[in-house]
């Protein structure tokens, strides 16, 4: 199987594109996912990843690049969720649930109008083996831009993630960085549609970051480990999916889940926590 996969990489351009794209998505999703984990925003990641669906469907209807529609609707969902939470007594999980279900319902309606089930099926569940050169370079470009923003604004992102009250008292514009993170999350969700589809994007964001969190208390180390695990899961998932002729996106997600399951039992932080619980 390994030999056949390596031969395929040497012979088939589509497999080369798939590998490069999968690694790029694994790295950037792993990095952004760390901030999502630390802020307790896993539900927000799930909501935005599904909220891009009507944008994709509308893009097919209008005949424009689906990146445009997906980004617009992803940002719209994040702004709407934050606005509802900030300007009413409704809690964030309720705001997320309302927005998530509404956007998903709109997406289903637009899918019926678009009448392009094949392409939209790939958007829902991913088809990384169909990634073209243009899509690959867009993914690399978006991923590089997201990572650059994280590096340049690491300190305020770190501060607003761990202690937003302290950050506010120091003059840091907490809301600005919240919306910035939502923009980054939306961009990652759009690019990850290529590999795992809108249904499984949240797993690419959350699982590697959660696994890395079991091993380290340093955000830099967590980001590096999470990105590495995301890339490794993407490589192994692509290998398994291609070799067995099964869904590559699902293989990537399950591989990442296996990493988490193993780490759950062997990670030092997890074992210390179990020891502390058993001593009470």
Give the positions of each predicted feature:
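Short juxtamembrane and helix-loop transition motifs at transmembrane-helix boundaries
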Residues: 4-13, 27-38, 55-65, 158-166, ...
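Alpha-helical transmembrane segments in multi-pass membrane proteins
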Residues: 21-30, 51, 55, 59, ...
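Loop-to-transmembrane alpha-helix initiation sites
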Residues: 18, 66-74, 93-97, 135, ...
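Transmembrane alpha-helical segments in multi-pass inner-membrane proteins
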Residues: 201-250
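Cytosolic-side transmembrane-helix boundaries in multi-pass membrane proteins
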Residues: 246-280
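Short loop segments and helix-boundary regions at transmembrane helix junctions
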Residues: 34-116, 213-224, 241-244, 267-268
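Transmembrane helix-bundle core of multi-pass membrane transporters
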Residues: 2-17, 88, 96-155
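Helix-loop-helix "hairpin" substructures at the membrane interface of multi-pass membrane proteins
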Residues: 25, 136-208
